[in-house]
UniProtKB/Swiss-Prot annotation:
Methylated by PrmC. Methylation increases the termination efficiency of RF1. It comes from Pseudarthrobacter chlorophenolicus (strain ATCC 700700 / DSM 12829 / CIP 107037 / JCM 12360 / KCTC 9906 / NCIMB 13794 / A6) (Arthrobacter chlorophenolicus). This is Peptide chain release factor 1. It holds the Pfam family RF-1. GO terms for molecular function: translation release factor activity, codon specific. The keyword Repeat does not apply. Keywords: Cytoplasm, Methylation, Protein biosynthesis. Its main location: cytoplasm. Peptide chain release factor 1 directs the termination of translation in response to the peptide chain termination codons UAG and UAA. The keyword ATP-binding does not apply.
Length: 357
């Protein structure tokens, strides 16, 4: 059992040796890559040694129990501990998404429902911001278009963590949030007290660590400048500070107008563009590799309804995992971990099943 781990143990030893060489840090890109891989392997190495120690302890206990019945009571306990350790190790050996350790750019856009959808988009932004705070992550609004009533027609926020451990990475925790989030409640604009249904779309993009990591040919870019506009379309700037960047090979378009200068908007736009191109490239790899199992619950498609937030019943329901709870008020205040964990566990189980096939 776990014969394949030896190769990972050898790789871990090799990486530790490299990280112990000061010369490695002259290449920061390589050092970050080695650091991320080391963090991923650390958990596997620790889990394997735990399993290996319990296996040896169980073998010794069985030998002693054969000679002295008093030791027999230890055998069932060690068997249970060994099975638990084996299950943990099996999960750690599931091939991880290569982007799990990355930070993310989270996009929330009001969908059908007009002003109410924009208000709900703002509620989702607050939910994610508070969840990020609970995990010690930092958030930064990159771009936002506010609605007349104070919500968001669309907003982009960068979420940054501090752990190199892929299992604790921002993308690993948030990547299943992409899709349509539907809300059922009485809008603030509703005078008759009727419940309305509206929606907001969420997109989660893994962020490129450094610009050099993803080379973009400047000849592949079309850059347009125009004047910024605020709620209602009124001009908020007398200079052409807003920027629209089109990546011609992929057709990806990013518009940015939050910053005061054209240069700042261009830098922010390129940051988002790199994230979108990285996600686009990964989608192409997934599509080209017929043997790679696509995630059953992660989507880059805003049109797939993934969750319903029912305010009158204080209920939240995830349509992919079957998760349901009546603590919507707590969820909207950032208590999102059980919902997210249900998606992670479903994905892990699907990956385990695929390995067993």
């Amino acid at each position: 059992m776990f014969e394949s781990v030896q190769g990972l143990l050898d790789e871990h030893d090799s990486i530790q040796a490299q990280l112990g060489d000061p010369a490695v840090y002259a290449d920061q890109r390589l050092a970050r890559k080695l650091g991320r891989r080391s963090a991923q392997l650390n958990g596997i190495v620790e889990a394997y040694h735990r399993w290996e120690g319990l296996r040896d302890d169980l073998s010794a206990a069985r030998e002693m129990a054969a000679e002295d019945p008093e030791f027999a009571a230890e055998v069932p306990e060690l068997e249970a501990s060994l099975e638990t350790a084996a299950a943990k190790l099996r999960r750690l050996l599931i091939p991880r998404d290569p982007d799990d350790a990355r930070n993310v750019i989270l996009e929330v856009k009001g969908g059908e429902g007009g002003d109410e959808a924009a208000l709900f988009a703002g509620d989702l932004l607050r939910m994610y911001t508070r969840y990020a705070e609970s995990r010690g992550w930092k958030t930064e609004i990159i771009s936002a278009t506010e609605s007349d009533l104070g919500g968001y027609k669309d907003v982009q926020v960068a979420v940054k963590g501090s752990s190199n451990d892929p299992a604790e990475g921002v993308y690993a925790r948030l990547k299943f949030e992409g899709g349509v989030h539907r809300v059922q409640r009485v809008p603030v604009t509703e005078s008759q007290g009727r419940i309305h249904t509206s929606a907001a779309g969420v997109l989660v993009l893994p962020e490129v660590d450094e610009p050099e990591e993803l080379e973009i040919n400047q000849n592949d870019l079309k850059i347009d400048v125009y004047r910024s506009s605020g709620p209602g379309g009124q001009s908020v700037n007398t200079t052409d500070s807003a920027v629209r960047i089109t990546h011609l090979p992929t057709g990806i378009v990013v518009a940015m107008q939050n910053e005061k200068s054209q240069l700042q908007n261009r830098e922010a736009g390129m940051r988002v563009l790199r994230a979108r191109i990285l996600a686009h490239q990964q989608e192409q790899i997934d599509a080209a590799n017929s043997e790679q199992r696509k995630s059953q619950i992660r989507t880059m498609d805003r049109s797939e309804r993934i969750r319903t937030y029912n305010y009158p019943e204080n209920r939240i329901a995830d349509h992919r995992t079957g998760y349901k709870a009546y603590n919507l008020d707590q969820v909207m205040n950032g208590d999102l971990e059980p919902v997210i964990q249900s998606a992670i566990e479903m994905d892990e189980q699907a990956r385990l099943d695929a390995i067993g096939d």
